[in-house]
């Protein structure tokens, strides 16, 4: 973050009202770090995000007595167990699918979580997920919408397993133009159409595999598309706070946010190491080394930079594999310039390989 951006964030923070008691006016309670909260207006939220400040909007937690919990215990495999199955599934992943789906997502004026086109894009995505499930003929697979306290909804596809242990790959579906959130052009090709279509292609890969379906996965698999990430991880909080209250056994969550920009230097993934689960991160490295053709390096993105933070905050082990090291991220996001012309679909396909390997290896793991 530049010095000018830091000064802007400090100025905005100075006018925010700290504390759990709701002030007068239309204010939102945000968390900038563990236990560090401030009241801000919606306009201040947008300006803080534009200045590089990340946060979780926790307004809906007022009165719930939220308490952070220890992570759900998990036992991740130390070795690759299903290389033949995963390799055969990877061979059927399609760069053309990624291109077609991302082009369609980018054609909406924006996918802002409070706009009409944000709802229309979610409906379109829901139809694509339903189509994948219907065409697979997979028994028990389903998709459902999870409503939020705003217009756009979350989408969750489920492949039930023989245990209640759950493995998740997720991406946020919304986009934003920081200059004009509601009406501005925000194709959001990289942020985060790229992650959304990667998760969709991973779902195709899993459900399209006869070997996978015949193997009867041990653990339940879920594919998530979150609404309202750009407003402070809103949709993913809806999901993971509910999972926490329901006592769900989420053993692993892989976040795919930014998956199409190759960067300016050496092509490599960025493994987010802050506010993530270190044991799961090691498993992710093993998956990348086995199933992808590019290396992975450690990087940090700050508190609440994306939806894995909602899982982590609610006690669920989470990791994020990003398109590059954080400092080499796409400079065109959050604007009308976030278009497919800046993206590399071979790089995006590598993300799909990782997502597919992650879900298959953990889906088949026993005693997770």
UniProtKB/Swiss-Prot annotation:
Cross-referenced SUPFAM superfamilies: Zn-dependent exopeptidases
Subcellular location: Secreted
Enzyme Commission designation: 3.4.11.-
GO cellular component: extracellular region
Glycan attachment sites: 92, 192, 216
Keyword Manganese: no
Keyword field contains Signal: yes
Keywords associated with the record: Aminopeptidase, Disulfide bond, Glycoprotein, Hydrolase, Metal-binding, Protease, Secreted, Signal, Virulence, Zinc
Disulfide bonds: 301-305
GO biological process: proteolysis
Cofactor: Zn(2+)
Stored InterPro entries: M28_fam (IPR045175), Peptidase_M28 (IPR007484)
Cofactor: how bound: Binds 2 Zn(2+) ions per subunit.
Record-listed Zn(2+) 2 binding positions: 191, 230, 334
Residues noted as binding Zn(2+) 1 in the record, renumbered to the chain: 172, 191, 257
Signal peptide from the UniProt entry: 1-18
GO MF term set: aminopeptidase activity; metal ion binding; metalloexopeptidase activity
Pfam families (UniProt xref): Peptidase_M28
Summary of the function given for this chain in its UniProt record: Probable extracellular aminopeptidase which contributes to pathogenicity.
Assembly and oligomerization: Monomer.
Sequence similarity: Belongs to the peptidase M28 family. M28E subfamily.
Descriptive protein name: Probable leucine aminopeptidase ARB_03492
